[in-house]
A protein has these predicted regions:
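Non-catalytic ligand/cofactor/substrate-binding and regulatory segments of enzyme domains
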Residues: 1-149
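Charge-rich (acidic/polar
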Residues: 143-291
């Protein structure tokens, strides 16, 4: 069985941006970019799994069905999909707590106007020729992260089951928003516990408001009533508002547990390098100015 490695590196924004993540097989002979670059990263998680299945999930564009950037998800969701055969996630990447709160573990699967089917390729097994180690080498020696706890395994299994049961083709926009709000509820309960009382109600409202606002800008963007730069800036504002509203609902310890960041720390998810590849330099400058 092959090895799948989660890798990450800091983006150009560095201090207030999430890490970019991608996936590489254990030999280093194949990598999947997950919307962005696929070299120069640091390994931070790994597991055994079929590299042929990972490649099937990734698809030729290496985006794993995360069809529209900032609509269905970001690199974290694409990487999680590709890592499915190994049963691991990119949860140790900076900003992952925010991206998973906004897009779920495996992305928004049915959010108009971009469908993002999660083809898990269950019938595919084996390994790519370039991912088969012919001898022991430094590339094959992977530093593994702390093994998942029983609670983490149970939580991840419940998330996979939720995605498997949800039919995006039969779902209305409201169904989709509720599905992702329910995924966030799972994340909250896993990170903070079951007995949250009014805190759980407050966080649910924060998430539902994000879902409504996100859908609003996605529809406007799809109808070409927003330019790419306007959409990205609006998405960044929603991302920051979500963090502000979440921080207002939680104490410092709770915020750290939920989003894996300090109470006053904020990140944005829109990677300038990916925006550059999608929309060009003028859009990057309009969104972020001179980097």
């Amino acid at each position: 069985m092959g090895v799948l490695i989660a890798k990450k590196y800091s983006t150009k924004l560095f201090l207030n941006a999430a890490d970019h993540t991608y996936v590489e097989c254990g030999t280093g002979g194949k990598a999947w970019g997950c919307w962005g670059g696929k070299t120069g990263g640091t390994a931070f998680n790994s597991g055994t799994g079929s590299t042929k299945r990972a490649d099937c999930i990734a698809k030729p564009d290496e985006r794993a069905g995360i069809t529209c950037y900032l609509i269905n998800g970001v690199c974290h969701q694409a990487a999680n999909r590709i890592l499915l055969p190994a049963g691991i996630l990119v949860s140790a990447a900076r900003g992952y707590g925010v991206s998973s709160a906004l897009f779920g573990t495996y992305g928004k699967t049915g959010f108009w106007p971009c469908s993002a089917p999660f083809d898990q390729c269950p019938g595919v097994s084996g390994d790519l020729p370039e991912c088969i180690a012919r001898s022991r080498s430094p590339k094959a020696a992977i530093t593994r992260t702390q093994p998942a706890t029983e609670a983490e395994v149970k939580y991840n299994r419940s998330v996979k089951q939720a995605y498997a049961k949800f039919d995006p083709l039969a779902a209305s926009p409201l169904d989709t928003m509720q599905f992702h709000a329910n995924l966030f509820d799972r994340q909250v309960k896993f990170r903070l516990g079951e007995d949250l009382g009014s805190v759980a109600v407050s966080l649910r409202l924060v998430k539902e408001n994000f879902e409504l606002d996100h859908r609003h800008i996605v529809v406007k963007f799809g109808q070409k009533k927003m330019s790419p730069a306007e959409f990205i800036k609006a998405f960044n504002e929603l991302t920051l508002k979500f963090q502000d509203d979440t921080a207002s609902s939680l104490n410092k310890t709770q915020y750290k547990k939920l989003l894996d960041m300090g109470h006053d720390e904020r990140v944005v998810l829109a990677d300038p390098a990916i925006i550059l590849s999608l929309y060009g330099e003028a859009t990057v400058k309009e969104v972020y100015g001179k980097l």
